[in-house]
């Protein structure tokens, strides 16, 4: 084979010019490349070894790198081929011995080689062996006698101890891990630290002057009043209600019994309520009565609406919020979800009265919540921590809060909010109305209720928080300390005959003295106090349990933890230091379903404790004697905080509002129609709020129409006769509208030489041919001749308007200018005058005739009388002008107020020019109530 055809000196290489390969040898030159495939090694090439020896090293060197690469690929490709061919079935060739063996093999012969089936077979064998062993044990146990199963077997207590030993963390509440981790600038997670919220600092309420407010709005429906005591018991039993407390209101059984107005009832019907739930039947009357309440009911019982509906009526009776005021009602709840849910209910029912609600909870935008609080909201629904944050940052305050609700108090305590809850309650005025709702009534909740509620009514719906009624409490009021001793020695034998007696004394010295005195009387007793050794205590308690000693004299060290069912009588010889200790004392009897009696001996010096005792008895449905109540009333704080009975404030259903605010769209029923100072007394009720209310404009129009019809009354005949001179001389009717001035009288006045209105009637651009004034001036000074100005009222006197033609002409020019500048208001006023003709003055024609008939006399120079009549009718003029401006500005209160000031400011001392300047910012005027 000739590899190089170029001759001597030419370069060897590949290519068409580098070598020539014969047709027979062409395949052999490619064999080395094919030999490095995945199916064979380099040595398998037969043609490579037959090539000429000189060319072998040169050719091998050229392809050395490629050979390396191919060897690597071949190594990995072998693995891929092996792995890919693992699952392929083996099919032997035709007519081969393996093929014959394959066909002769049984189909399930390889099932023994399946590892899963082998494992399952082993498990079944083990189970069979275990069953056989258990059967043998049962046979042995039956043959053996004298073994007690109740001793040998593990009982519940042993199982509990074993479980606690194996699970030391059982019962520990694991803190939930927060998924929302925060990361620093490098992307490393920041370890979450629980935010510690300090409670609000204490506050001295005696330094704050709180305005009084009304709490009681409940007027009992006559159907409920007519119920007999037995029917009342049956109704509560039917509703599955248990009520305790001092004089609880009777429950209602329908919405009509609550006395809600139509606006609230419309929202209730819209929310698809058909009848109140059991907790609402009793809770709404309690809350409407202004009483503090403990509501114990499960979730979903309707307790949210039970405190929202009375809250709306409570808010509507108070003054509107001023800038910087905090909320009137605060609802505190444990979680954000519950906060949003209650907030939605408050908005749904609050829009009936255009009340604003704000939800304040952790996780929300602090800035947005602070902004909403600063804009003003009557209702705040909050979680404790976030409310405290806002109060500390002065975004709001609790000065005006008079309705406080704690919902799901037990969950707040479980979440560790006890101190925050107490600090919020301590920051609200002490005479507030407080409602506490909980699903359970544990000791912590009971203690909180005693601390923050005053004379609460406890309403239990369902089978939660069953009160212990096995203890009967009897209070004996004695004159002095020696009377206690006489009472005890007289009754002690009787008590010991029915069971063991436990005597409680406050001080150790008194306990020892009482024990020694009783021993001298021959009574067998034991003594227990804190200075005794533990062995002595144990011996006394053991003897008392065995009934070896029937009487035990003890201090409060025995009040807690003594569980002796044989105690039938507890005697509080000295009153306890506080009501908590008293509760634990009387709890020593009436245990394990046994009945017991607790006696408490009081003297007149125990009036402080008597108040606590009254509330304790009322909370336990025990009888409170009149003597005990009289003794408690000697205490100033109890007398002040005691709930007041009597009927609630009238709700004015269908008419005016509660107290300071009227219902939207309704006229006031109780304002004084004759007093001009009260004309705008209800104006503040219609100020537009910042909330989005679709029908607010309609309500305002209806409100002003109602005000218009109620405030302006038709003139009587006596007013016409009394104001005859004024009606013609000045063009004002007795109601103060400029609706008719005769043309003839004006002309006569022009011809008369001494008429003070000689040029004014010509120059006034408001007269038309019919004699009606279409554009009325905004302010009218009183006119007098030769100083008769003094006869006008003080509000109407103007400087420099006396006698003299020059001054009269100046008045005429100024008056005309005034009319011209306020022509728009005058046109509207003219509309009001025409409305007056059709609505209030059917006899306007006769009055016009009367004015024409007496025009000469009236215009003949009776300027003094003219001034008097103008002064007398000024109040009505103000009303009529106000009416015109109301119509002009389409019931806009802001424009109304500014124009009202323009109308009413009659003390301008400017000598020349009566044009009213730009209205200043509205200040308090005499129209405000």
Swiss-Prot record:
Q: What is its EC number?
A: 3.6.4.13
Q: Which residues carry this modification: Phosphoserine?
A: 58, 96, 104, 109, 111, 185
List the PANTHER family hit by this protein, alphabetically.
ATP-DEPENDENT RNA HELICASE DBP3
UniProt short sequence motif Q motif, positions renumbered to this chain: 253-281
Molecular function (GO) terms for this protein are: ATP binding; ATP hydrolysis activity; RNA binding; RNA helicase activity
- Protein name as annotated: ATP-dependent RNA helicase DDX42
Quote the record's binding site residues for ATP.
297-304
For region Necessary for interaction with TP53BP2, the annotated ranges are 739-828
Specify the Helicase ATP-binding domain's residue ranges.
284-459
Stretches with biased composition (Acidic residues): 70-84
Q: Where is this motif: DEAD box?
A: 407-410
Which parts of the sequence carry Omega-N-methylarginine?
A: 12
Residue ranges with Basic and acidic residues bias: 821-911
Modified positions (N6-acetyllysine) are: 5
> GO annotations under biological process?
protein localization; regulation of apoptotic process; U2-type prespliceosome assembly
Stretches the record annotates as Disordered:
25-119, 182-203, 662-682, 723-929
What family does the database annotate? Belongs to the DEAD box helicase family. DDX42 subfamily.
According to its UniProt entry, the function of this protein is described as: ATP-dependent RNA helicase that binds to partially double-stranded RNAs (dsRNAs) in order to unwind RNA secondary structures. Unwinding is promoted in the presence of single-strand binding proteins. Also mediates RNA duplex formation thereby displacing the single-strand RNA binding protein. ATP and ADP modulate its activity: ATP binding and hydrolysis by DDX42 triggers RNA strand separation, whereas the ADP-bound form of the protein triggers annealing of complementary RNA strands.
User: Assembly state and interactors?
Assistant: Transient component of the SF3B subcomplex of the 17S U2 SnRNP complex. Interacts (via the C-terminus) with TP53BP2; the interaction is not inhibitied by TP53BP2 ubiquitination and is independent of p53/TP53.
Q: Which intervals carry biased composition (Polar residues)? A: 738-777, 787-798
Using the UniProt entry, state the residues involved in the cross-link Glycyl lysine isopeptide (Lys-Gly) (interchain with G-Cter in SUMO2), renumbered to this chain: 894
Q: Which gene encodes it?
A: Ddx42
The reaction(s) catalysed by this protein are: ATP + H2O = ADP + phosphate + H(+)
């Amino acid at each position: 084979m000739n590899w190089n055809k170029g001759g001597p000196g030419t370069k060897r290489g590949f290519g068409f010019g580098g070598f020539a390969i014969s047709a027979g040898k062409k395949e052999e030159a490619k064999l080395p490349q094919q030999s490095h495939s995945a199916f064979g090694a380099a040595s398998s090439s037969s043609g490579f070894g037959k090539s000429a020896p000189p060319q072998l090293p040169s050719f091998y060197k050229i392809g050395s790198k490629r050979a390396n690469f191919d060897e690597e690929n071949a190594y990995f490709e072998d693995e891929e081929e092996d792995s890919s061919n693992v699952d392929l079935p083996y099919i032997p060739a035709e007519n081969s011995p393996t093929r014959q063996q394959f066909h002769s093999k049984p189909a399930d012969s390889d099932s023994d080689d399946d590892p899963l089936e082998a494992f399952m077979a082993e498990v079944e064998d083990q189970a069979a062996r275990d069953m056989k062993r258990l059967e043998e044990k049962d046979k042995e146990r039956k043959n053996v006698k004298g073994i007690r199963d109740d001793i040998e077997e593990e009982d519940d207590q042993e199982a509990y101890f074993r479980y606690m030993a194996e699970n030391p963390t059982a019962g520990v509440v694991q803190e939930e891990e927060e998924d929302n981790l925060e990361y620093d600038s490098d992307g490393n997670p920041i370890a979450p630290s629980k935010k510690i919220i300090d409670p609000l600092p204490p506050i001295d309420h005696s330094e704050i002057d709180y305005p009084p407010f009304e709490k009681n709005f409940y007027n009992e429906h006559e159907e409920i009043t007519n119920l007999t005591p037995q029917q009342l018991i049956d109704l509560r039993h039917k509703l599955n209600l248990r009520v305790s407390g001092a004089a609880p209101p009777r429950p209602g059984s329908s919405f009509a019994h609550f006395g809600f107005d139509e606006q609230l009832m419309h929202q209730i019907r819209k929310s698809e309520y058909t009848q109140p739930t059991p907790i609402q039947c009793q809770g709404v009357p309690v809350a409407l009565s202004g009483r503090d309440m403990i509501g114990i009911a499960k979730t979903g019982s309707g307790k949210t609406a039970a405190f929202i509906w009375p809250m709306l009526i409570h808010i509507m009776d108070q003054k509107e919020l001023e800038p910087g005021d905090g909320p009137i009602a605060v609802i505190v709840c444990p979680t954000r979800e519950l906060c949003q849910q209650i907030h939605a209910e408050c908005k749904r029912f609050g829009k009936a009265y255009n009340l604003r609600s704000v939800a304040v909870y952790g996780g929300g935008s602090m800035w947005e919540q602070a902004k909403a609080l600063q804009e003003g909201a009557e209702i705040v629904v909050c979680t404790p921590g976030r409310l405290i944050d806002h109060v500390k940052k002065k975004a709001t305050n609790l000065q005006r809060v008079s309705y406080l609700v704690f919902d799901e108090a037990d969950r707040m305590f479980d979440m560790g909010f006890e101190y925050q809850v107490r600090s919020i309650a301590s920051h609200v005025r002490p005479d507030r109305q407080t409602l506490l709702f909980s699903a359970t009534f544990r000791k912590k909740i009971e203690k909180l209720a005693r601390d923050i509620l005053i004379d609460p009514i406890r309403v239990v719906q369902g089978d939660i928080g069953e009160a212990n009624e096995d203890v009967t409490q009897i209070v004996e009021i004695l004159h002095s300390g020696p009377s206690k001793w006489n009472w005890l020695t007289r009754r002690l034998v009787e008590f010991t005959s029915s069971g063991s007696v436990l005597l409680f004394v406050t001080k150790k010295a008194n306990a020892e003295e009482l024990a020694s005195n009783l021993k001298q009387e021959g009574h067998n007793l034991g003594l227990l106090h804190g200075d005794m050794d533990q062995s002595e205590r144990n011996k006394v308690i053991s003897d008392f349990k065995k009934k070896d000693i029937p009487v035990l004299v003890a201090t409060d060290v025995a009040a807690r933890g003594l569980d002796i069912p044989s105690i039938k009588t507890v005697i509080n010889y000295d009153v306890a230091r506080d009501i908590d200790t008293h509760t634990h004392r009387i709890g020593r009897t009436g245990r394990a379903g046994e009945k017991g009696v607790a006696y408490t001996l009081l003297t007149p010096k125990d009036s402080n404790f008597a108040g606590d005792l009254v509330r304790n008895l009322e909370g336990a449905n025990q009888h409170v004697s009149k003597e005990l109540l009289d003794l408690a009333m000697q205490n100033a704080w109890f007398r002040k905080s005691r709930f007041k009975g009597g009927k609630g404030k009238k709700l004015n259903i269908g008419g005016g509002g509660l107290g300071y605010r009227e219902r939207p769209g309704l006229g006031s029923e109780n304002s004084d129609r004759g007093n001009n100072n009260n004309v705008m007394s209800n104006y503040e009720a219609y100020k537009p709020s910042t909330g989005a209310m679709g029908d607010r404009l309609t309500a305002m129009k209806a409100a002003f129409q109602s005000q218009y019809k109620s405030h302006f009354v038709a003139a009587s005949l006596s007013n016409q006769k009394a104001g005859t001179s004024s009606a013609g001389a000045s063009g004002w009717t007795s109601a103060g509208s400029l609706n008719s001035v005769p043309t003839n009288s004006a002309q006569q006045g022009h011809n008369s030489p001494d008429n003070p209105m000689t040029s004014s009637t010509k120059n006034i651009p408001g007269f038309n041919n019919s004699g009606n004034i279409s554009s009325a001036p905004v302010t009218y000074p009183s006119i007098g001749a030769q100083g008769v100005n003094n006869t006008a009222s003080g509000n109407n006197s103007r400087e420099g308007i006396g006698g003299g033609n020059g001054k009269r002409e100046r008045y005429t020019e100024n008056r005309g200018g005034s009319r011209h500048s306020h022509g728009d208001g005058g046109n509207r006023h003219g509309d009001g005058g025409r409305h007056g003709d059709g609505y209030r003055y059917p006899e306007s024609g006769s009055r016009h005739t009367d004015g024409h008939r007496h025009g000469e006399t009236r215009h003949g120079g009776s300027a003094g009388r003219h001034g008097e009549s103008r002064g007398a009718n000024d109040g009505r003029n103000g009303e009529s002008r106000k009416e015109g401006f109301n119509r002009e500005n389409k019931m806009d209160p802001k424009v109304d107020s500014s124009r009202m000031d323009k109308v009413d400011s009659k003390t301008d001392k400017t000598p020349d020019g009566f044009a009213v300047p730009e209205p200043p910012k509205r200040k308090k005027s005499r129209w405000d109530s």
